[in-house]
């Protein structure tokens, strides 16, 4: 599909979404009225700049179901964040939403070269966290076998990985680093494992970390991007060219904005990423501010896909440190640490009164 055709789809869906949220979500109807905006004012994707922003505080202020656009009788799944810094952020899915999400993750898995002959070991956490069930549904959607082991119990992870012939591992990159160390120490040589692909997400990781993961596990390591508020894993994914993260922009429309002014900025500028749902029924969000810092690129990828590509997430607006006038992100510190061959894993710890909650 060329960019012009994609833009036509995005325009049709945005026009429909503006009508949908106005008539089904009191929160957005009030926002529209305060701005003097009518659904009919949205005529194409170019008009997205007229729509109001949404942020995490809006979700918490409307906890638990204040942003629902359908009756709870139509909601078939509820996910939520841990709520470590306040009320949990609740996300609602209809049956159609789950099918869309599974399709989005399926695109990622097929881009990595996965198929129905593969055995997925899903070591993301299951439960309120979106990672486990999201990866599970995406794998079953392409007809693959799934080991729903969830996270933890490393010895059992290694045993099942060996005995069941796992070919694809899904987990956080930090846990994958731990599994890589465990593989060195387990009773079987690495050659006895059938692992070939790692799908890593739910936390930022660097190219240096990719190299270490591929060396320790004997795999090709791929990034998968997502956030619970938008859908979960599968919002974006790498292809085999690994030249950026393709965003499923027919479902989730991305913008890059100045984090201070909220103004859109040109392609290639490293700024804040926002998403607008184009098809979601249960709890659609308009211009949701992720606070993730990245850049977008619209030229066609070598793989043939025309979906926009996103640079690796540099960090979050609220994670940035200013050290002697220089902007520094945790990912940059990790990149330096991982250059030391003596270090296989690292973690961030915050100490001090201001970190207590």
Q: Language-model features: where?
A:
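Nucleotide 5′-phosphate-binding alpha/beta core
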Residues: 1-80, 85-103, 107-111, 115
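Active-site glycine/GP-rich loop and adjacent strand/helix microenvironment
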Residues: 1-5, 12-22, 26, 142-357
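Short glycine- and Lys/Arg-enriched binding-loop motifs that mark or flank ligand-binding interfaces
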Residues: 79-82, 121-123, 127, 222, ...
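Short, solvent-exposed beta-strand edge segments and adjacent coil->beta transition regions
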Residues: 88, 117, 318-320
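AMP-binding/adenylate-forming
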Residues: 94-108, 119-178
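Glycine-rich helix-loop-beta junction characteristic of Rossmann-like nucleotide cofactor-binding loops
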Residues: 110-114, 138, 189-190
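Phosphate-coordination loops involved in phosphoryl transfer and adenosine-cofactor binding
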Residues: 116-117, 195
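Beta-strand-connecting loops/turns
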Residues: 117-118, 268
